[in-house]
Amino acid sequence: MSDEQQQPVFSIEKVYVKDLSVEIPNAPRIYLERETPEVNIQLHSKSERIDETLYEVVLTTTVTAKIKDKTMFLVEIQQGGVFQIRHVPEAEMELVLGIACPNILFPYLREAVSDTVTRAGFHPVILNPVNFEALYYQRKQQTENSAAPQTPETQQITH
């Protein structure tokens, strides 16, 4: 085989919103509230091989805003991407799927969250940048130290 055929290949085949849900259980009265809500953000990443060279990576976020014990809104979005990955050493594949792909998907997820919350009638929620590399190594360290680790494809962030 020539050197060209063995060069690593990485391309974005598709970026899409896989799932989106919005709940505003206390509407319309919740719109009368003037207090600043407490916002909780959870972020998960998982990957799946869908054929010989294609992988799906999905970032899922759940954003919950509450005032005292009342939920203002709950938004859950799954931002998916299909990536073609070839000739990448197996040892590096976990890094590509756990760091590079989520870094590509995150701006799309951030935009979807902001747009969805705004369309629901609230001030936008802008997700802060995420260091997926630090999260990857933190999760890896937790997995090595834990008797019941999270699956390697999942990571969680709570703000």
UniProtKB/Swiss-Prot annotation:
Keywords from the UniProt entry: Chaperone, Cytoplasm, Protein transport, Translocation, Transport
Species per Swiss-Prot/TrEMBL record: Nitrosospira multiformis (strain ATCC 25196 / NCIMB 11849 / C 71)
GO-annotated cellular components: cytoplasm
Database matches in InterPro entries: SecB, SecB-like_sf
One BP term from GO: protein transport
Predominant location: cytoplasm
Function: One of the proteins required for the normal export of preproteins out of the cell cytoplasm. It is a molecular chaperone that binds to a subset of precursor proteins, maintaining them in a translocation-competent state. It also specifically binds to its receptor SecA.
GO-annotated molecular function: unfolded protein binding
Protein name: Protein-export protein SecB
Coiled coil: none
Lineage, broadest ranks: Bacteria, Pseudomonadati, Pseudomonadota, Betaproteobacteria, Nitrosomonadales
Family assignment from sequence similarity: Belongs to the SecB family.
Subcellular locations according to the entry: Cytoplasm
A Pfam cross-reference name: SecB
UniProt subunit comment: Homotetramer, a dimer of dimers. One homotetramer interacts with 1 SecA dimer.
NCBIfam families listed in its UniProt record: PRK05751.1-3, PRK05751.1-4, PRK05751.1-5, secB
